Amino acid sequence: MVDYTDIKILNLLKENSRVQWKDIGKEIHMTGQAVANRIRKLEAEGIIRAYTILLDEMKLGKSHLAFITIFMKTNEHSRFLDFIVTKDSVVEAHKISGEGCYILKVFLESQEQLNNLLNEILIFGNYRLNLSVNKVKG
């Protein structure tokens, strides 16, 4: 069971997963060891699954962010899933309900790369493209 203190710890870790336990403890009025015990419990329960980094794709030269909704031609999805795993530009892929089968979040360096990816996707089905013009949260 997660309590209010656990939520505060999780929120601090979401801001910076490299923060030291003693610094979290100062923030929430606990010892570093008590924070460590709570974090280990959250890890053991699978609530904390991994510690990772967030990249600024724009600073890496990938200035085109697009969301692509995929409408599969057939129900043979395994080839498509194998395909997207090989694409570094696909940073997220979700199977969705409603309109479409999948939605992809892609970062690309150029319009040409986007066109090439879209042409490859046509092998599997049609798509709807949405380009991000401004990030408002996250």
Regions found by a protein language model. Give the residues of each.
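A compositional/biophysical signature of low hydrophobicity enriched in polar/charged and small residues
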Residues: M1-G138
